[in-house]
Structures are given as C-alpha cells and as structure tokens.
Regions:
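Charge-rich, low-complexity N-terminal segments
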Residues: 2-109
C-alpha cells in the first residue's frame, strides 16, 4: 500500500484574502466587485465571500497567488494608485482539508 491515501485524495490550500484600494474615498464596493469578478475567472478556484474578506480554496498555493494578482490587476485598471491586501494561507500537507471540512469540525465540537 505504501504512500498512504493522500495522493488519491484532494489536497487543498485555503486562504483568507482581503484587498483595499487606498485614497479613493470611503466606498470601495465597486472596487471589491471588480476584484471578485477577476478572481472568478481563475480556473480551479472556489470562493466564498464574507463581509470583510473572501475565502479562496484551490489545489495549490500557485492558484491562490494567481487570484491575488488578478485582483490587484483589476484595481490597477480602475485607476487605484495604491492597493493594500492581506493574505493568510493554510496549506495543510498531512491530510486533505477543504473549507467545508474546517467548518464542520467546529460544528461537531
């Protein structure tokens, strides 16, 4: 059997991502909308929007980083002169863990 079942199961990276254009005023909804539209075009990415961030789920960190770049590019194309983003990545390698699994594990406590 060697190698365990990890190769057969889906390994995922989960990230919490938020992006903030700076110097454009207090309303950023249009910018966030464009960033989310850009992210939605990334193949192999699952998203869940929350009030203060978006959760990204992908098979690898590379796909998550592509989403971050796409969102920055979208804001630059809208004329943003400065962009701040926060990215926190959970890349668990010992067992497969999707975002729904993490939520269910807390509910089961």
């Amino acid at each position: 059997m060697g190698g365990g079942g990890l190769k057969k199961r889906r390994i995922v990276s989960i990230a919490e991502f938020s992006i903030h254009p700076i110097g454009i005023g207090t309303s950023v909804g249009d910018y966030v909308k464009q960033a989310l539209q850009a992210i939605s075009k990334i193949e192999g990415l699952i998203t869940r929007s929350l009030p203060m961030a978006t959760i990204l789920e992908a098979k690898n960190v590379h796909t998550i980083l592509k989403a971050v770049e796409a969102s920055h590019s979208a804001l630059r194309s809208m004329g943003a002169k400065r962009i701040s983003s926060i990215l926190r990545i959970d890349e668990r390698l010992d067992k497969p863990r999707m975002m729904k699994d993490k939520i269910e594990s807390v509910r089961d406590c």
